[in-house]
Amino acid sequence: AKRMSEVTGEEAKTIHRLLQVDWDEKDNPVFTRNERNPLECDCLVVDELSMVDAYVFESLLRALPFSCRLVLVGDNDQLPSVGAGNVLGDLIASGLFPTVQLKEIFRQSQESLIVMSAHRIVEGKLPDLRRHDSDFFFLPQEDPQKAAQLIVSLCSVRLPRSYGYSSVTDIQVLCPGRKGELGTVELNKHLREAINPPARGKAEAKVNGALFRLGDKVMQIRNDYNLPWAKEDGTAGEGVFNGDMGVITEIDKPGGAIHVRIDDKDVVYDFERASNELEPAYAVTVHKSQGNEFPAVVIPVLDPPRQLCYRNLLYTGVTRAKQLLILVGRRGVIDAMVENNRKTKRYTGLKWFLLNEE
């Protein structure tokens, strides 16, 4: 929603917010916009449809008036929704709806090796890992500890020195998973100590085992529709969303509050809320990055869990990079990810119901 507002200049909302989500006693979503209380719109555009599960999509359809035009936008080669279903893929595969494939690239130039590599990955072909004269690099490394050290060096020293990137706002490490030496948990510890080390006078707070330090890069890990924010121009509102990233600008220990700058908004968390909703974001999972884009992306590809070693995950990570992409690890892992088109094994019934509806 944030990115769409930036690009279009129009208000954009998450589907949950559009449908005015509430929560039942079991913390399940309940949408107050539905067939009895429909939306008031003539045309609705839904972006990133590959991330929308079957339940949310059904709820959206129930809330639309029959006169509304629905335009669906998404990349069927990216990661499927976390929840059940393969909505975008099934709608396309049914052949019942007018479909247009967009081929012109706006994030990079057509000559970009990032673009060429993304196309090859989608086609099940290995990207060119030998070139070192473009925006896509592969740095071979067999040892997880040395790979972690290399990633930390890239993010804290080499890329800022060579390209002028900010270690906090421009460079993003994307990991297949959270666990292991090259998962987000361990890498965040190493990256934080290199990029934002402790110092005399630099405020810190430890809450429920979570460490927060002034200057830390953090990510909102769940939607919070009631969290207030304010801008310098006096504009105020509510709502911070899953995947939003920011930097800690103040830690008020006496007041038990943490201030985070998310884009041009100042968001104040009490300590309890921060420990439940914020995580370090020097490294995040590819899943959490979906829908975002970054000037420079570094991806470890050395020892991901087998269940995360598949094509759509690699493709999604690669396509988050706008200007520079670096893969660190083993060529064999990249081969395995490109060859494994596991997404085809997600079993759903939407296509069948569409084609057999009486």
Sequence positions of predicted segments:
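Conserved helicase NTPase catalytic core signature
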Residues: A1-G9, G180, R273-S275
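Conserved two-lobed SF2 helicase motor
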Residues: A12-R17, E279-Y282
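Conserved helicase motor core of P-loop NTPases
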Residues: N76-G239, T249
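Residue-level recognition of short, solvent-exposed, well-ordered loop/turn junctions
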Residues: P65, R213-L214, F241, S289
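Structural motif
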Residues: C43-D47, L174, M219, V298-P300, ...
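Conserved helicase motor core of SF1/SF2 NTP-dependent helicases
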Residues: K2-V7, I15-V30, E35-E142, D216, ...
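Short beta-strands and strand-coil junctions in structured, solvent-facing domains, enriched
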Residues: V52, L79, N226-L227, P304-Q307
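C-terminal accessory regions
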Residues: E123, K231-T235, N242-E358
